[in-house]
Amino acid sequence: MDEVCAAPAPKKMVAKSLVLNTFRKASVKEVVELKKPWKKVLWRKQDYPDNFIDESFLNGLQRNVNIQVTDFWSLVADSLPVSQHLSSVVIFASVFVSIYRNQLSCALVGFVSNVSAVAAFILWDFVLRKPCNNRTFPNYMGIVKSCILIVLTLAGLSPILMSLTKSTSPDSVWAIAVWLFLANVFFHEYTTETIRPHVRLHNSLSTNAALSASVVLASRLEKSINVFFFILFAVHWFALFPIFRKYIHVFSFYADMLMTLVLIISAYIALNAVASVVIAFVFLSLIFFISFICPIWFIKLQRFKNEIHGPWDIALPKLGPSKG
């Protein structure tokens, strides 16, 4: 039997199918071209699915735009206020221990504190406040009245403060003082870029905590005159001396560094006298860690910073003088 072979399709049918396929492809292409370009907006209904991601979606992505790379010595300079305040707390605690052990005269502490406060005020008035753009003329009469009021108030309250913790065990007094000093260190304002005339909440909490700790410690002294001089020293040390340190920091880096070294050395000598060499060495190690190891650590961690910005972020208003 002869093999049956399929007859070839007519030429007209082949041409017709080619025309139809070409028309379909052209129609699909026209439909795609008729779509409007995708825009990165949510409020407009577009001819694209909700999960559509255009190739231009991340064109506006920016990484680490606002990061400021700081050098080592700038970070060391920024760590000086921390070292200064820690040294100040250590010096104050060492002075109290020396007075409590009758190794140091409280009257001598009060005299040195008053003389230092007057000298610091003269230095601030004639030297420090001018480079800091502090053009306000100080009210000397008001300052004198405030000083007299503080002295008279402390003199009147000293007998009362002396008997404040008579019924409290010494261990409880030391524990309360330690916690208050920790609050002082934690809430202290270490930013010194500008001298702000207003008082911040956390800075006032720090000062109040230190003065409260001073009152608690002063209540363990035996004479009311010692309580008076010790609290007066605390007012100078925790209320006025931090302000003076800020002006020194703004005035000169070298003066700030010199004052930091003096405070650290004084704190080391004081700890060595009232405690031991081991505790003094631990304090120096802590200061070294804060001043040198932490800046290096911070610089190393900056390379892991990944902050992204783009046109999808919330617009920030640009405030300035109005035109016209």
Curated annotation (Swiss-Prot):
Localization in the cell: Endoplasmic reticulum membrane
Function of the molecule: Part of the complex catalyzing the transfer of N-acetylglucosamine from UDP-N-acetylglucosamine to phosphatidylinositol, the first step of GPI biosynthesis.
Transmembrane segments: 80-100, 108-128, 141-161, 172-192, 224-244, 251-271, 277-299
Membrane side Cytoplasmic: residue ranges: 1-79, 129-140, 193-223, 272-276
GO cellular component, one term: glycosylphosphatidylinositol-N-acetylglucosaminyltransferase (GPI-GnT) complex
The name this protein goes by in its record: Phosphatidylinositol N-acetylglucosaminyltransferase GPI2 subunit
InterPro entries found in the cross-reference section: Plno_GlcNAc_GPI2
Assigned protein family: Belongs to the PIGC family.
PANTHER family (UniProt xref): PHOSPHATIDYLINOSITOL GLYCAN, CLASS C (PTHR12982), PHOSPHATIDYLINOSITOL N-ACETYLGLUCOSAMINYLTRANSFERASE SUBUNIT C (PTHR12982:SF0)
Membrane topology designation: Multi-pass membrane protein
Gene Ontology MF terms: phosphatidylinositol N-acetylglucosaminyltransferase activity
Gene name for this UniProt entry: gpi2
Pathway named in the protein's UniProt entry: Glycolipid biosynthesis; glycosylphosphatidylinositol-anchor biosynthesis
Sequence ranges on the Lumenal membrane side: 101-107, 162-171, 245-250, 300-324
Keywords: Endoplasmic reticulum, Glycosyltransferase, GPI-anchor biosynthesis, Membrane, Transferase, Transmembrane, Transmembrane helix
Pfam families: GPI2
Enzyme category, top tier: transferase
Species name: Schizosaccharomyces pombe (strain 972 / ATCC 24843)
Highest taxon of source: Eukaryota
